[in-house]
Amino acid sequence: MKVALASRNPSKVKAVEEALRILNINGTVEAVDPPPGIPPEPMGLEATVNGAVVRARHALSSIKDSTYGIGIEAGVLMLSAFNVNFDVTVAAVIDRKGLITLGLSPAFMIPPAFMRELMTGKELNDVVEKYYGVPNAGKGIGFIGLLSRGLIKRINLNTEAVYMALLPRMPWNKDLYELSD
């Protein structure tokens, strides 16, 4: 099976490979450039899901012999009632019938100082670099890797989002999710 991924980010490519391995899916990942026009820091769950779905559709249409297209998008989940914001990763998996399944990673709180900068239009990667002095952390251990001092890495969050999105497609779950071949 060939899986198309709308990202060349090494963390995302490795995450999809790892999710396939965990679920015992024999497949290869082919990375393509993401589609143009995706906002760098989606605000809200719907915007983040939409970004993942747009990426997944683009991946599927870019690799004609792929079984699935996968999009992975990190964004900000806002809980205004508690004045708290979370970083969350959403994975979308689309097949040739157009069926989309979604998965989310664990989410972690974004520090208020970081959030203030994001609200001015800055990208999280730039804010992380300013505070930690690590350029392009998103292509490596990620913001979570820096916050957790390496205990949790971005690849872990990406992997969990992807296998959560693939779980409904597993043979033992298809009936539960009312999916047909």
From Swiss-Prot:
GO terms for molecular function: ITPase activity; metal ion binding; nucleotide binding; ribonucleoside triphosphate phosphatase activity. Its EC number is 3.6.1.73. Its cofactor is Mg(2+); Mn(2+). Mg(2+) binds at D65. It catalyses: XTP + H2O = XDP + phosphate + H(+); ITP + H2O = IDP + phosphate + H(+). Keywords: Hydrolase, Magnesium, Manganese, Metal-binding, Nucleotide metabolism, Nucleotide-binding. Disulfide bonds: none annotated. The keyword Lyase does not apply. The keyword Nucleotide-binding applies. GO terms for biological process: nucleotide metabolic process; thiamine metabolic process. Pfam families: NTPase_I-T (PF01931). Binds 1 divalent metal cation per subunit; can use either Mg(2+) or Mn(2+). Homodimer. Phosphatase that hydrolyzes non-canonical purine nucleotides such as XTP and ITP to their respective diphosphate derivatives. Probably excludes non-canonical purines from DNA/RNA precursor pool, thus preventing their incorporation into DNA/RNA and avoiding chromosomal lesions. PANTHER family: NON-CANONICAL PURINE NTP PHOSPHATASE_PRRC1 DOMAIN-CONTAINING PROTEIN, PTHR34699. Belongs to the YjjX NTPase family. This is Probable inosine/xanthosine triphosphatase. It comes from Caldivirga maquilingensis (strain ATCC 700844 / DSM 13496 / JCM 10307 / IC-167).
